[in-house]
């Protein structure tokens, strides 16, 4: 079924806005995935702050033109499902990676982050990025560990001086 020119322009504009706002993008082939599974993926994507859309390749190429995601143009072949992470760079990669575990036919093609192309085997790097809250928690544990070590060292010095004075 042919799409009207106005509809094509609207799709390109919508995807372009998502691309401009996106921190990272992941491209996948969802051939053979059931409608129920795709609905579940879209629901999880909304909750994770990820924009997910199936778009024709020619429209997708126009939509990402001039953005940091135009490095993905070569993988826009066949049915293309694209996801843009809006809140955390690893959200879309993590979402697709988890979804692919339960779907044999779901294939992650590639990703882009900060204008760099990531092949399908490099998705784990993007998916393993800690979220903002996880990063803060890691930083706080490092700071807490350092301060407790300092407190123990100062207590040991105090005990040594008290023992030497006695």
UniProtKB/Swiss-Prot annotation:
- Keywords linked to the UniProt accession: Ribonucleoprotein, Ribosomal protein, RNA-binding, rRNA-binding
| UniProt cross-references to InterPro entries, sorted A to Z | Ribosomal_uL10, Ribosomal_uL10-like_sf, Ribosomal_uL10_bac, Ribosomal_uL10_bac_type, Ribosomal_uL10_CS_bac
Gene Ontology terms, cellular component aspect?
large ribosomal subunit
State one molecular function term (GO).
large ribosomal subunit rRNA binding
The protein's superkingdom reads Bacteria
Query: How is the quaternary structure described?
Result: Part of the ribosomal stalk of the 50S ribosomal subunit. The N-terminus interacts with L11 and the large rRNA to form the base of the stalk. The C-terminus forms an elongated spine to which L12 dimers bind in a sequential fashion forming a multimeric L10(L12)X complex.
Job of this protein? Forms part of the ribosomal stalk, playing a central role in the interaction of the ribosome with GTP-bound translation factors.
Q: What is this protein called?
A: Large ribosomal subunit protein uL10
Q: Which organism is it from?
A: Ectopseudomonas mendocina (strain ymp) (Pseudomonas mendocina)
